[in-house]
Amino acid sequence: MANAPVLLLKEGTQRSSGRDALKNNILAAVTLAEMLKSSLGPRGLDKMLIDSFGDVTITNDGATIVKEMEIQHPAAKLLVEAAKAQDAEVGDGTTSAVVLAGLLLDKADDLLDQNIHPTIIIEGYKKALNKSLEIIDQLATKIDVSNLNSLATRDQLKKIVYTTMSSKFIAGGEEMDKIMNMVIDAVSIVAEPLPEGGYNVPLDLIKIDKKKGGSIEDSMLVHGLVLDKEVVHPGMPRRVEKAKIAVLDAALEVEKPEISAKISITSPEQIKAFLDEEAKYLKDMVDKLASIGANVVICQKGIDDVAQHFLAKKGILAVRRVKRSDIEKLEKALGARIISSIKDATPEDLGYAELVEERRVGNDKMVFIEGAKNPKAVNILLRGSNDMALDEAERSINDALHSLRNVLMKPMIVAGGGAVETELALRLREYARSVGGKEQLAIEKFAEALEEIPMILAETAGMEPIQTLMDLRAKHAKGLINAGVDVMNGKIADDMLALNVLEPVRVKAQVLKSAVEAATAILKIDDLIAAAPLKSGEKKGEKKEGGEEEKSSTPSSLE
């Protein structure tokens, strides 16, 4: 009995444990990071992703790449989760987070080969992370964002946006300049000052619409909102100046009773009386809106044909079936109150805009609501020659918006171009000597992983990576803390801040946190148990004959 096999897992279940499981997971994560490495930085290359429907996406945006890839390996999925966490928290630095996590795991693999326990590596990495965050705060430069409309502040913000967008499809020339100004204007409008300093930037109040046709230069920022709808009736005006706008989430229709009901009609006069009463009900609703001064009606629900007729007779422009999210943005943009009950509506519920106009954009008609007095929501309308260019422009703008939000929430910046990583590596090696023990080796490997970032940037720019790192180390040893890789000119610069290559501290710190969390999560796994695939026709949790639910206890021999 003592030598009998223990039957524990379902037949067909695969299990690997200890060093084998860890090596397998590290290999999967490092492979994913290797795929993204070439997309890092302003000279990063694009990936062409083709989904199962044949749709093509061309991008170098890390968040989009990992989202579109159908990752199967569970360890690689942990890196995908790290990218999603990075994207959700700060909206930028996703490629950096995945690549750094892969580098940390690659270095951890070297330590495992030296028989250093994963727990010691994890502790070393955590100490290195905490020290790195401390050093980043010391290296950071505070910027003045007290007046978002001042030329000096706008100039500083433009430099930050430029660094974020320089790796994207639309980078360069007048197109980029126009997009940068639109993004800064949009953020300046919706930003809300915080009592402790800095700003809260609710990005959900900045709507981005895309319309094929024209070029990126034809894009515009609307101080109000653009609705992808048409005016509902041909007899209505197409243009209303000094618009007083009723924003409704009630239908301009005769409501159906909640319970099923039938009407017994015995004569033609009764039909006429019924229709007349219905028309009167709708006319009263329109008269009420007209009486409070509304000359534009934006409705979340339907507008009856008869109501459309009465609105047209009153010269009121109306739009129906508007999305709830747009209704809420209109409330913020126009200073309106959403009207749920038309009979209780008052003039104070109306919003104001200088102009409401239906225009043709490309092949479609859209309603522009512009010139709100004090808008708290705005709309960026993107134009472009094809869907791919529009999608990449939208991703660029999203990255830029998040970058500005990060720097306004915490107005501190550091030098880009691998300058911070090189300085961190230098100081972490000094710190490692003070820690001692085997954890010292983990901290030194953390420093090595950070130094790979400027090497990757150099490689994407066609520079010699090892020579670049040697030169960078020499400059940082002399005290040039902002020396980094100038990838645009293919050389090393003494001061990346002077070249306007700036990154928000919040993004840089989150990259380190996300990467370390993902790497340590994988290093903690020492057992990998993969259930046998379901047989055809079998469902998860399906009951066997005899009525018992099948569980993963069907025997598999484990010696």
From Swiss-Prot:
SUPFAM superfamilies: GroEL apical domain-like, GroEL equatorial domain-like, GroEL-intermediate domain like. The keyword Coiled coil does not apply. One of its GO terms (molecular function) is unfolded protein binding. Residues 536-552 have a biased composition (Basic and acidic residues). It comes from the Archaea. Residues 536-559 are annotated as: Disordered. Molecular chaperone; binds unfolded polypeptides in vitro, and has a weak ATPase activity. Forms a Heterooligomeric complex of two stacked nine-membered rings; one of alpha and the other of beta subunits. This is Thermosome subunit alpha. It comes from Sulfurisphaera tokodaii (strain DSM 16993 / JCM 10545 / NBRC 100140 / 7).
